Amino acid sequence: MRRIYSFLIILLMMSAIPAFAQKGGVIKSRIVSTDNTPLQGAIVSVVGTSSSAISDENGNFELTTDQRKGTLRIVANGYYTREYPLKKRVIPREIVLVPDNFSYYAGTTQYPFYSERRDTRSAINASLDRRDMKNSISADLAWQDGISGLQVVKKSGMPGEGAFFNLRGIHTLVADNAPLLVINGIPYFYNSDVSNVINGYSRDALFGYNANDIKSITALKGAEAAMYGSLGSNGVILIETQQATSDNLNTRISFTGNYGVSLAQNAIPSLDATQYRSYLQDIGMTRYSSAADLRNDYPFLNPGRNAYSYLFDNNIDWNKEITRSAFVTDNVFRIEGGDEIAKYNISLGYTNEGGIVDNTSSQRFHTLINSDVMVSRWVDIFTNVNLAYITSDLQEQGMKYETNPLLAATFMMPNLYPYTRESNGNLLSSYATYNSWNVNKNPVFAYDNVSNPLALVNTVEADDKIYDVNVRAGLNWRPTENWTITGMVNIYYDYTEESLFVPGVTDQAIVPQLYGTGFNYVSKGVRKLSSY
């Protein structure tokens, strides 16, 4: 009886062998698109072997292989790659490929030293390909709303500042919440500090990279992040840039240009001159003992015209005075190709981001040079060189009312004028001084003087200049068909030079710095950051 059972089990196992193995190792199938259109020229291969075939005009192919294990891969231009395990199931008679303009299909998730199909990976990890990212001047803002659990929030409207991002929300109010960035398998330690020169300003994390040079990102939130130790305690974001790894050896030249306008739309609501006069009248009576004392310090509260009407007879929206629509552009020129020995992928780009605060902008010149050279059948050498040069015209931010133009515009009285007015009505080209409206030399309460917002955006010089270099070189050695040993070296260098000049002696339109003792304020700093 046991022999009969054994015979039946063997018979069942033999019947479970894939159909192509029973026919001498021949795989036959038909490749179609989602609309049932036959796909001609699709490449079918068994990964790791020389067995391959190409589909004909009817989408049919026939491939001979003696492999019972491994992966069957189907590649077609303009479609997602599809794979089937030879061991687990019979290859279907009709294989459907999905066009790559569909978002979030299977694809692959890229890890530091291997890739994994998205439909087989851990659900706690997520990835995003370039085709699914947003068009953005900032590389990190291109990920916004792309990955579940990855929070990306733009820091401010200042050009070049980028975004704050974290995984699974804020974990601490003291330490850093940002996840570890890993670019092409190498941890990326960027300058995340707030500037000591330009108040409230911090650089974009990926300021040296163009969004078009990012091939894919993967967010690690689970056990996979443990390989980075305490550095990965806030999660890990794996970034893969464009590489010289395409199987298409034809020389390809492309240009991508994006042009647009940044609009200053939603300003903080502020009082007009009439509303402010009513507000000051009400709030003033809670401090002053009499209306006469209040009107003596603020004569524009008196009904009708008076000797000081030329100073206060205005209605200015200060936010509109210092903001404007700004032009933005992002341009990338790319050339890629190669031959059987060497491949290359080179991009050159120029980015100009105008800020909505007048006279602010950021310009970037960058290049990404990738190469892959096959030294022998078992050895190849690869390099990635990213170079960027950035210059910016900025303004101070944060709770510094003397030099933050947006804060000054919020505090400034709407009935004052940005330029000097004479008592006879003549308008001068010089900026109104910060205390030009102080009509009483001995006020009951000290005047709350505010810097002239228009003078801030036109005379303050806040600049930065950055040289950023990131070089990676490596070697792949394949001692056997199933083993690959990779060695890499990475050098990162960042040079940042910042300067700030706040004038005050000539026009006296800006509240003096250093507790009222410094009329001209100069600050300069240099930061050098390197890692390898």
List where the protein language model places each region:
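Structural motif
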Residues: 24-39
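Short, acidic, small-residue-rich periplasmic hinge/interaction motif at the N-terminus
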Residues: 32-34, 43-45, 75-79, 89-132, ...
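Short, acidic Ser/Thr/Gly-rich low-complexity loop/linker segments typical of extracellular
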Residues: 50-60
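Short acidic/polar hinge/loop motifs at secondary-structure boundaries
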Residues: 61-64, 186-221
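N-terminal periplasmic accessory domains that precede
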Residues: 89-99, 112-118, 139-142, 163-168, ...
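Residues embedded in well-ordered regular secondary structure
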Residues: 117-136, 146-149, 158-163, 173-175, ...
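Transmembrane beta-barrel strand/turn architecture of Gram-negative outer membrane proteins
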Residues: 149, 164, 213-216, 225, ...
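Flexible, surface-exposed loop regions and adjacent strand-edge segments
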Residues: 197-199, 270-277, 363-366, 398-407, ...
